[in-house]
Amino acid sequence: MSKKDFQIIKGHKHIPYRPQKYPEDVMIDRAKGFYEMARGRRTIRAFSKKPVPKEIMIDLIRTAGTSPSGAHKQPWTFCLVSNPVIKKQIRIAAEEEEYQSYHKRMSKEWLKDLEPMGTDWNKPFIETAPWLIVAFRKIYDMDENGFKTNNYYVTESIGLACGMLLLAINNAGLSALTHTPSPMNFLSSILDRPDNERPFLLIPVGYADDDAYVPDIHRKELDDICIVYE
């Protein structure tokens, strides 16, 4: 690489960034098209048992891995699970925690807010969906000498990565559910994850069942979420 192909900035090499550029009319079409794809995304709980190729799932994880992160630490691990024995273990443990949540931990207001979703402590989708993605946040890392190294904005970083993951799932023609049984420590034990990794999100992924229904709920209008300053 010749000298003109990079610059040294504050002692570190920086390479040129040449993003794809489009005419403005194409940009408008692409932005609207992406929005139309994204607005079709729904959380589902009725999955088809139709297999999903592992190759697709790997590319979805690759997409999540392109997310920005604090100090570029990339503080995440994504576990892909299709093994039926492991999925059953996860379901049993999740339902034990969810039973306690629905019967003892959740407030009346919380339970009332959940009523339109039609949910309860039973989580059959954990076994029905062909794949589970379990996202772990890495609260610290270890260097090659076994010393702890800091990670920064870990929750924000993995949240961004999971958002990109959900859009990638929808873009591929698949559906997903964001599931957060609380507490989730059982995921660390079942998947044998190290002490520096904490479970963040359990995402069943697959094709929507032909008879899938979703709640008749609506997203906020643009005026409720966007303020423009010109």
Cite the ranges covered by each PLM segment.
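N-terminal accessory segments that position/regulate proteins before the catalytic core
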Residues: 1-44, 48-58, 89-92, 103-104
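C-terminal helix-cap and adjacent tail motif
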Residues: 2-26, 201-230
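Glycine-rich, charged/polar anion/phosphate-binding loops
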Residues: 63-65, 116-121, 187-189, 212
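Glycine-rich phosphate/pyrophosphate-binding beta-alpha loops
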Residues: 65-71
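A glycine-rich helix N-cap at a beta->alpha junction
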Residues: 98-106, 192-215
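Small-aliphatic-rich amphipathic alpha-helix that forms the alpha element of a beta-alpha
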Residues: 41, 59-65, 133, 139-190
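Glycine/small-residue-rich phosphate/adenosyl-binding loop
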Residues: 4-7, 80-158
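Short loop-to-beta-strand entry elements in the cores of soluble alpha/beta enzymes
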Residues: 71-82
